[in-house]
């Protein structure tokens, strides 16, 4: 009993003088919340930026998921405050007799880190919250105790991580995406290989992320008592179990879903429909031709119509912005959608009978081009077929307009012409064809004629003419009208010449279905781990401040209070909702276009890099890993798809993060020491 009384008295005596610093504790809580806000506005983009960029989730959905997993992760995993940040960079034992100076240093470090992260968020530059707090900690220590208080060897490791993190993560992401593209994306039918690889992908995702979470040794979950072999065994066991579940239950369901999506509604068929076999196409063609003959007998067409001599197999078009997929040789034929009740004449001057009775006749020049190259596909399109709505949806997915909510993006205007929009969204010039109207024995005839090279006159065309124009590759991307590019938001991309190349290698609908949930799962795991890791950056100095005030001991080993972690988690979530979209736009849209397959490669390889680097002992930055992966995968898809000027700005922001946050922290610490505390 006497010993207990003695220890209690000693603790009270130690903390007694610190009561005068209550104002500093309150100020520290306020600044810590601002710091957590800035972490949410900047660092959370690491977890869901690529998912939003690929269109897998909207910004609102990302904020909801991130709020849940960041908060849970901060409470469950954040109890193990990073020793590198709190004690590894400076010698805290030097502040045994000057606890007030250490408290002032904690406030200064939080202020310097928060200010620079807010500035970076305003500039839409993703930076490392870890390196911010590192620079700020070094800054106040230099003012308080000089160079003797800094462990420069730890700083050298951090400088190395600037280059190791993006390089290592970029290499891993590049290798993974190369394998995915070679064995899945570039296959004529990517579904079989994709379904075979699905259990492996899920197993790797679950195994790597579970190991990362358990390896942190969270006390609340009891992971700190697990040996390394136990962590590995549990991770591998869960991964194998997940693979079996996916193989026996998820894959069959996914296969049925893909088949159902392929047999899509008529409104989607102009873009996404894919027939199962040529035999089915032939049967449907026969049926459609018989219907046409019953409804529009050849004799009724008139002298201008040549009897139906050949029927071309049906093939609908799946195209990308500014890009046409290479069709197999057997499909490089003029084709029409006979389901739309259209007949085709196989004579030299081919003519197509429209459902409304109109006859569209191709001129000699167009027919010669078709016959010589076999590259142009012509389809009938009705204005009520839903194409306009489908194209609008496709554009929004490609530009991430519905996910970003960027008010600066100007929506395309229809301009009273259905197909001006059709052609603009396909990335085609508006003057590729001219429409000439005339009368031919009581029948309306439209002629498609080859344009003169110097003709730039805009004309209004009906849906059929413009859709033919859209799917025909008549001009190179460099000849696209600048106004169309401006409306599509492509004309401003200084970092990539030939901006249409940024849309290359877009995932097919069935491939997107395979990778969508994988990317969401990986992002949720990443957000959970991020909440536990980065809450240390926001709350670590506050924990030190609070424990010094509460116990009077600068090297206190008291467990971190849960309510402090929850406080930081709430601040992170508010920062994400209020200002998170700015950096998310940079990570998911501006740096390079993201697809579900590339986004999954980025997420998984980044998580693997963090696990490896953590075992090595590097204070690795998740931000640097994600940016390195995004740039690496974007460069593999197309060198011109990466905005290298933006990447240069991001790298420069990394380079100045430690000095700027350190200078701000040092300035505040100087005010505390020489003006306020006079110590």
UniProtKB/Swiss-Prot annotation:
Keyword Nucleus attached: no
Cellular localisation: Cell membrane
InterPro entries: Phos_transporter
Biased composition regions of type Basic and acidic residues, renumbered to the chain: 271-286
Region (Disordered): 268-288
Residue(s) carrying Phosphoserine: 265, 269
Membrane topology label: Multi-pass membrane protein
UniProt keyword list: Cell membrane, Membrane, Phosphate transport, Phosphoprotein, Receptor, Symport, Transmembrane, Transmembrane helix, Transport
GO BP, sorted A to Z: cell population proliferation; phosphate ion transmembrane transport
Membrane spanning residue stretches: 21-41, 62-82, 100-120, 158-178, 203-223, 230-250, 511-531, 558-578, 600-620, 650-670
Recorded GO CC terms: plasma membrane
An MF annotation (GO) of this entry: sodium:phosphate symporter activity
Reaction(s) catalysed by this chain's protein: 2 Na(+)(out) + phosphate(out) = 2 Na(+)(in) + phosphate(in)
Region described as A: spans on this chain: 550-558
Function statement: Sodium-phosphate symporter which preferentially transports the monovalent form of phosphate with a stoichiometry of two sodium ions per phosphate ion. May play a role in extracellular matrix and cartilage calcification as well as in vascular calcification. Essential for cell proliferation but this function is independent of its phosphate transporter activity.
Protein name: Sodium-dependent phosphate transporter 1
Designated gene of the protein: SLC20A1
């Amino acid at each position: 009993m006497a010993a207990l009384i003695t220890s209690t008295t000693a603790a009270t005596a130690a903390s007694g003088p610190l009561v005068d610093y209550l104002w500093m504790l309150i100020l520290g809580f306020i600044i810590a919340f601002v710091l957590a806000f800035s972490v949410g506005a900047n660092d959370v983009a690491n977890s869901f930026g690529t998912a939003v960029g690929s269109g897998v989730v909207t910004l609102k959905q990302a904020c909801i998921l991130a709020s849940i997993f960041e908060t849970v992760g901060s409470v469950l995993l954040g109890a193990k405050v990073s020793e590198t940040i709190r004690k590894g960079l400076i010698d805290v034992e030097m502040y045994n007799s000057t606890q007030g100076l250490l408290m002032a240093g904690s406030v200064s470090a939080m202020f310097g880190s928060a200010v620079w992260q807010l500035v970076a968020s305003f500039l839409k530059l993703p930076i490392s919250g870890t390196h911010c707090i590192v620079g700020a900690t070094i800054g106040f220590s230099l003012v308080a105790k000089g160079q003797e208080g800094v462990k420069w060897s730890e700083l050298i490791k951090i400088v190395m991580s600037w280059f190791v993190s993006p390089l290592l993560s970029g290499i891993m992401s590049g290798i993974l995406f190369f394998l995915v593209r070679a064995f899945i994306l570039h296959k004529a039918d990517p579904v079989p290989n994709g379904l075979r690889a699905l259990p492996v992908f899920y197993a790797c995702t679950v195994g790597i992320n579970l190991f990362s979470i358990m390896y942190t040794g969270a006390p609340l979950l009891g992971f700190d008592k697990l040996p390394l072999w136990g962590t590995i065994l549990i991770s591998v066991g869960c991964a194998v179990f997940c693979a079996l579940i996916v193989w026996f239950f998820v894959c069959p369901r996914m296969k049925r879903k893909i088949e159902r999506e392929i047999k899509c509604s008529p409104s989607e068929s102009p873009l996404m429909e894919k027939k199962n076999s040529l035999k089915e196409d032939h049967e449907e063609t026969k049926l459609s031709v018989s219907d046409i003959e019953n409804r529009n007998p050849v004799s009724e067409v008139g002298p201008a119509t040549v009897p139906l001599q050949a029927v071309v197999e049906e093939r609908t078009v799946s195209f990308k912005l500014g890009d046409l997929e290479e069709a197999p040789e057997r499909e490089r034929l003029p084709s029409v959608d006979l389901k739309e009740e259209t007949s085709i004449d196989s004579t030299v001057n081919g003519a197509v009978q429209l459902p409304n009775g109109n006859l569209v006749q191709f001129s000699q020049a167009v027919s010669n081009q078709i016959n010589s190259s076999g590259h142009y596909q012509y389809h009938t399109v009705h204005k009520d077929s839903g194409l306009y709505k489908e194209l609008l949806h496709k554009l929004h997915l490609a530009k991430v307009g519905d996910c970003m909510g960027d008010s600066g993006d100007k929506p395309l205007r229809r301009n009273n012409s259905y197909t001006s929009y059709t052609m603009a969204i396909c990335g085609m010039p508006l003057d590729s064809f001219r429409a000439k109207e005339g009368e031919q024995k009581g029948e309306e005839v439209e002629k498609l004629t080859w344009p003169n090279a110097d003709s730039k006159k805009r004309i209004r065309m009906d849906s059929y003419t413009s859709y033919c124009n859209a799917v025909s590759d008549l001009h190179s991307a460099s000849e696209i009208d600048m106004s169309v590019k401006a409306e599509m938001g492509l004309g401003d991309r200084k970092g990539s010449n030939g901006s249409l190349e940024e849309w290359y290698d877009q995932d097919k609908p069935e491939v997107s279905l395979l990778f969508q949930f994988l990317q969401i799962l990986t992002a949720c795991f990443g957000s959970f781990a991020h909440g536990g890791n980065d809450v240390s950056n926001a709350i670590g100095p506050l924990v030190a401040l609070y424990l010094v005030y509460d116990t009077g001991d600068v090297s206190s080993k008291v467990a971190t209070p849960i309510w402090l972690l929850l406080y930081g988690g709430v601040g992170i979530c508010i920062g994400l909702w209020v200002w998170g979209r700015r950096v998310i736009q940079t990570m998911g849209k501006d740096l390079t276009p993201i697809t579900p397959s590339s986004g999954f490669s980025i997420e998984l390889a980044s998580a693997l890099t963090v696990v490896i680097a953590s075992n090595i002992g590097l204070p690795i930055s998740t931000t640097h890993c994600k940016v390195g992966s995004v740039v690496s995968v974007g460069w593999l898809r197309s060198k011109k798809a990466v905005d290298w000027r933006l990447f240069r700005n991001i790298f420069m922001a990394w380079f100045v993060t430690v000095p700027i946050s350190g200078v701000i922290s040092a300035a505040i610490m100087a005010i505390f020491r020489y003006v306020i505390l006079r110590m």
